[in-house]
Amino acid sequence: MKQAPRPALALRPLAAGDEGELLRIHRAPEVVRWWDEPEEGFPWSDEPEATRLTIEVDGRVAGLIQFYEEPMPRYRHASIDLFLDPRLHGRGLGTEAVRRLVRHLIDDRGHHRITIDPSASNAAAIRVYEKAGFRRVGVMRRYEREIGGEGWRDGVLMELLAGEES
């Protein structure tokens, strides 16, 4: 039996036409529980220190991946984050998007360390990052506020060093 062809994944700069689909994906319960509720408009365009890319799968907007670069040259590290349309979860697309961005940050931008900090209770995201080569460094206790709540949740600090990419 033939295996279905793997979907074509691309990372590209955000475009104004991405707004509606990214907001729809971002508001999905599986996404918004880990990300702040978006305000009106296109909330990802007003943070100049972050670089955001649209994740496309088979030519369609499928999510967002972003990175923040440490501005001090002696550190040369970046942190990343992403969300993906829940309808595409479980297909390896998040892992592939992370791998591609990591390669770009190491090969093209000269970073030697990439970090990510998922919620400690977001087991699916942690698995994605581990498949991409990230290792757990430690738990950051009471790291971020619960979305829509008064409590705190722990975060997991994960890192990948140049040469460790999978």
Each PLM stretch: what is its role?
Residues 1-20, 156, 160-166:
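Conserved N-terminal entry element of GNAT/NAT acetyltransferase domains
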Residues 95, 120-138:
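Conserved active-site alpha-helix within GNAT-family acetyltransferase domains
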Residues 107-117:
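Conserved GNAT acetyl-CoA-binding A-motif
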Residues 115-118, 135-151:
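Conserved catalytic-core motifs of GNAT/GCN5-like acyltransferases
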Residues 13, 29-89, 95, 104, ...:
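Acetyl-CoA-dependent GNAT
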Residues 22-23, 80:
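Hydrophobic pocket/interface hotspot
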Residues 50, 153-157:
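Short hydrophobic/aromatic beta-strand or adjacent loop that forms the aromatic wall/cage
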